[in-house]
Regions:
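Beta-rich, blade/repeat-based domains predominating
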Residues: 49-65, 71, 94-120, 149-166, ...
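Structural signal for beta-propeller blades
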Residues: 74-77, 121-122, 133, 174-177, ...
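Short loop/turn segments that connect beta-strands within beta-propeller blades
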Residues: 80-84, 137-141, 180-184, 224-229, ...
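Short loop/turn segments immediately following the C-termini of beta-strands
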Residues: 71, 117-119, 171-172, 215, ...
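A short beta-strand motif characteristic of beta-propeller blades
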Residues: 43-48, 85-93, 142-148, 185-192, ...
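Blade-level signature of beta-propeller repeat domains, shared across WD40, Kelch, NHL, RCC1
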Residues: 295-327
Length: 327
């Protein structure tokens, strides 16, 4: 689960005596300001310091920091828990970053996983560059490792299991790749050119199984993890309502996912081979990702339809906060 609920606290009452030294009074005032600042953690909106960001993915840490993958600038932006504006955290096109999509904060490993992809590869066109899953230290944004996708492809989204295994979707090749804890290279864990075509969002629930959606097919699937770690038969889940272009997806409970699709934020509850879809908010434009932190589900507006049209101003980008309590 990425998010957790923070309880609001009233700022402490500070009493001053006229005989108290000025230094102590200043320190006491600082305590009040810090306490008040922490109460602003439920930021209703996050903006960006730069234009043409096109934030395709986002993730968060327990302290409320938000990280965004910038598809427009091939960079990673961060908004700290005390800020309502995201600024560059990993510089544009540094460390071989290209076509930045998925990001995932793995606090247990102290790593921010980032999807970086080669261009081309569609309709038989050759790939240019290298598709890789990159690991950056959460402590200082330095590059810790880079793991190429065999045969390139399009690294789209990332999830991490309790045992440290990292899974990443490949949208172009219809597969899920795996990086075992301590491994030096990715391996192809699950592959099906038809069923996993346009594989996009990925998450794990308490059952330890891998859940993947397809942005092009509007489907949600479960891939069992066998005792030896290999992938079991892919199961297409029956959703209670159609899903239109499902994209970013995060686990927020034992059987619950948050999913963005068709301009909506959904709460999806898994029961066997069925998925109950509850719309939490609709009418949003160009949303592609969601994360939960501090009792707020943040949804990123990517507006990807304007990315390749330089004649149109996409306007300022933002991530909207929607109050949500994890189950």
């Amino acid at each position: 689960m990425e998010g957790h609920v923070l309880a609001k606290k009233e700022p402490p009452m500070i009493r001053f005596q006229t005989a108290r030294p000025v230094g102590l009074m200043t320190a006491a005032i600082a305590v009040v300001l810090v306490a008040c600042g922490l109460q602003a953690a439920d930021r209703p909106e996050i903006t960006f310091s730069d234009a043409r960001i096109f934030p395709e993915s986002l993730t968060s840490t327990k302290n409320g920091d938000l990280f965004f993958g910038s598809l427009g600038l091939d960079a990673v932006y961060r908004a700290t828990s005390k800020s309502a504006q995201a600024t560059p955290w990993i510089s544009a096109k540094s460390n071989g970053l290209t076509t930045v999509l998925g990001v995932f904060a793995d606090e247990k490993a102290g790593v921010l996983w980032v999807c970086s992809s080669a261009s081309g590869g569609r309709r038989g066109a050759p790939y240019v560059g290298e598709t890789a899953l990159k690991a950056f230290k959460l402590s200082d944004a330095s590059l810790k490792g880079s793991y190429p996708f065999p045969g390139n492809g399009l690294c789209n989204d990332i999830a991490v299991a309790k045992d440290g295994t990292v899974y990443a979707t490949d949208t172009n090749m219809g597969r899920v790749l795996r990086l075992k804890k301590g491994a030096s290279a990715l391996d192809v864990w699950a592959e099906d050119a038809m069923v996993l075509a346009t594989a996009d969002g990925i998450a794990l629930l308490a059952d330890g199984q891998v859940y993947v959606n397809s942005v092009g097919q509007g489907t949600l699937m479960r891939i069992p993890v066998k005792a030896d770690g290999s992938a079991g038969p892919i199961v297409k889940l029956e959703t209670s309502r159609p899903m239109m272009g499902p994209d970013g997806m995060r686990s927020v409970g034992n059987k619950t996912l948050l999913v963005v699709e068709g301009g909506r934020l959904d709460e999806v509850t898994i029961n066997g081979d069925k998925a109950e879809v509850k719309v939490l908010k609709e009418g949003m434009t160009g949303i592609t990702a969601v994360t939960l932190t501090g009792g707020m589900a943040y949804v990123a507006e990517a507006r990807l339809n304007l990315r390749n049209d330089t004649t149109k101003d996409p306007g300022p980008f933002r991530a909207m906060g929607i109050p949500y309590k994890a189950k």
